């Protein structure tokens, strides 16, 4: 389960390491849980590029994911594990005993036929979701809320997990995948276990075209541009004769861009390490 290395039959397969999709049990999404997804090619509502290197790619349907896990006390059976083109993780289709269907991010170790539940009285096992105050110290969690009821915002990518380190009054101390130590309010929900598909980091697309299928466009070096397009542009030869900067003139290579005096500073015990 995870990835497979292709034989070097062509240039495009020579270095390719791709998913084997062994964990997938259902190929078509649940119709009631998908909606159209409009492409924006990295543009905002003014038509300006706010995210570079985006555009094209295969047409997608958006899968509606339950990040809130707010259906408490009702067991749900894992009906299928599916591919989701909108994220690196897989998703699990749940059939609740009252007839409702929902998608969640697939945690490592959750199998078709398993039963899971959400709520403060749920058992501590993979796939169950509880408030942080009810989860023992040392437990690995994912899909962590920052505001109660808003839905999980942290630790949602393939293979990721955070660890609960301790409690301080109304807050729980968590180590995030980046290495950051942070306090999160104890009433926020989190799901037990690590996100599945840890092999995602081994993926090698193998050719430019596979990036284009994903909607990723080429990244052009600043030194290959004209002076009007980038601070590194122009000049004779390959030197740009200054400290490296971003396209907007901010120093790059280690320069901190997080603005000072942010509200969340008081919740960050230790900043992320390299």
UniProtKB/Swiss-Prot annotation:
Homology family: Belongs to the universal ribosomal protein uL2 family.
Subunit (UniProt): Part of the 50S ribosomal subunit. Forms a bridge to the 30S subunit in the 70S ribosome.
Function: One of the primary rRNA binding proteins. Required for association of the 30S and 50S subunits to form the 70S ribosome, for tRNA binding and peptide bond formation. It has been suggested to have peptidyltransferase activity; this is somewhat controversial. Makes several contacts with the 16S rRNA in the 70S ribosome.
InterPro entries attached to this UniProt entry: NA-bd_OB-fold, Rib_uL2_dom2, Ribosomal_uL2, Ribosomal_uL2_bac/org-type, Ribosomal_uL2_C, Ribosomal_uL2_CS, Ribosomal_uL2_dom3, Ribosomal_uL2_RNA-bd_dom
GO cellular component, one term: large ribosomal subunit
Protein name: Large ribosomal subunit protein uL2
Gene: rplB
A GO BP entry: cytoplasmic translation
UniProt-listed Gene3D superfamilies: 2.30.30.30, Nucleic acid-binding proteins, Ribosomal protein L2, domain 3
Ribosomal protein recorded as keyword: yes
PANTHER family for the chain: LARGE RIBOSOMAL SUBUNIT PROTEIN UL2M, RIBOSOMAL PROTEIN L2
Keywords: Ribonucleoprotein, Ribosomal protein, RNA-binding, rRNA-binding
Record-level Gene Ontology MF annotations: rRNA binding; structural constituent of ribosome; transferase activity
Positions of the UniProt region annotated as Disordered: 221-254
Organism encoding this protein: Sulfurihydrogenibium sp. (strain YO3AOP1)
Pfam families: Ribosomal_L2, Ribosomal_L2_C
Disulphide-bonded residues: none
Source superkingdom: Bacteria
